[in-house]
């Protein structure tokens, strides 16, 4: 089991989605947006950092399983100023997760859409619809929140993520030992990973 926090960064609105992954089953936990209504960029970044920190700390309190985070990579915008602001918002989000000692994985918008919709150029509405179907939601999340959930779904479906879950399970259940910051697996553990 694991908790996955997906983040869709934005300088005016940052979306987040939180899922629980048990094997190949995904369960919705929470989603929403962090709005930054101020014009001053430093204040926006502070709100993103503080908002994500509070939300994550709340879920860390109740989580018995590992927590992973995933964030959408910056795309190349036609307007350089927009790309710079988006990069700063993304940096604030990553800093919030790293400050809580969480690992951050990054995915392109195309990878996220491909994982959720099966088509890398899917429209935002298609992403929203597929997020609802995959998580069997009885409501439609706001677009930025749906994008955060989509990012979490993408991470859950990535082979990198699945391998980590298998490895964590193997280490906890089979006598693996930690020595000098490295895990030592038994031959049986290594066989289970294949």
Swiss-Prot record:
Any one of the GO CC terms: cytoplasm
Catalytic residues (UniProt): 8, 72, 144
Top-level taxon of the source organism: Bacteria
Catalytic activity line of the entry: Endonucleolytic cleavage at a junction such as a reciprocal single-stranded crossover between two homologous DNA duplexes (Holliday junction)
HAMAP family in UniProt: RuvC (MF_00034)
Similarity section: Belongs to the RuvC family.
Protein name: Crossover junction endodeoxyribonuclease RuvC
Organism taxonomic ancestry: Bacteria, Pseudomonadati, Pseudomonadota, Gammaproteobacteria, Moraxellales
Gene that this sequence comes from: ruvC
């Amino acid at each position: 089991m694991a908790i996955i926090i997906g983040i869709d960064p934005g300088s005016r609105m940052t979306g987040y989605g939180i899922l629980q992954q048990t094997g190949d089953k995904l369960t919705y936990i929470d989603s929403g947006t962090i709005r930054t209504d101020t014009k001053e960029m430093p204040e926006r970044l502070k709100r993103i950092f503080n908002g994500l920190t509070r939300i994550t700390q709340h879920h860390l309190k109740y989580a018995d399983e590992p927590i992973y985070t995933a964030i959408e990579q910056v795309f190349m915008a036609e307007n350089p100023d927009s790309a710079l602001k988006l990069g700063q918002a993304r940096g604030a989000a990553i800093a919030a997760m790293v400050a809580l000692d969480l690992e951050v994985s990054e995915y392109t918008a195309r990878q996220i859409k491909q994982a959720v919709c099966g088509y890398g150029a899917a429209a935002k509405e298609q992403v929203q619809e597929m997020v609802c179907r995959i998580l069997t939601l009885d409501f439609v999340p706001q677009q930025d929140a749906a994008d955060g959930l989509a990012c979490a779904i993408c991470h859950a479906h990535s082979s990198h993520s699945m391998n980590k879950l298998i490895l964590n399970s193997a280490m906890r259940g089979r006598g693996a030992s930690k020595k000098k910051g490295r895990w030592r697996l038994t031959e049986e553990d290594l066989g289970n990973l294949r």
